[in-house]
Amino acid sequence: MKPTELQIGDWIGRVSDDKCIIEDYRQVDWIRTGEIGMRYQKVWSIGCIEPIPLTYEILKKNGWKDAEFWCEYQEGNNSIQACLPDMRGRINGIDIEHFKCEYVHQYQHLLRLCGLNELADNFKV
């Protein structure tokens, strides 16, 4: 994973020396060459982090519900339908076809692109 793939507020996981993912997830607070600053945590080197796989369980934790062919999120004017893993669906009427979205931080980027910054920044893992 490279620092250029990340944005402030993205969720990532810390890995141990043997590269096994630890259930220690943090949001990126700042980024500089070779280091990532975490919220409420010390600095992590870029070699110590891994992306968090996006799963239906994580979507459901964030208010998504099962629909016939996908998960669906409805709140106010926001309407999202998502079909993993190739991310077919719609976000507020915008067709999303085969957007590469295997990881939580990629989904956060997609939400931000569609103007859903608050939802992206408050995403839970």
Each predicted region: which residue ranges?
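Amphipathic, interaction-prone secondary-structure segments
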Residues: 63-85
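Intrinsically disordered, low-complexity regulatory segments enriched in Ser/Thr/Pro
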Residues: 80-102
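Basic/aromatic-rich interaction segments and small domains that mediate binding to polyanionic partners
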Residues: 18-48
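Intrinsically disordered, low-complexity, charged/polar segments
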Residues: 40-65, 100-114
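Charged phosphate-binding loop/patch that engages nucleotide di/tri-phosphates or the phosphate backbone
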Residues: 115-125
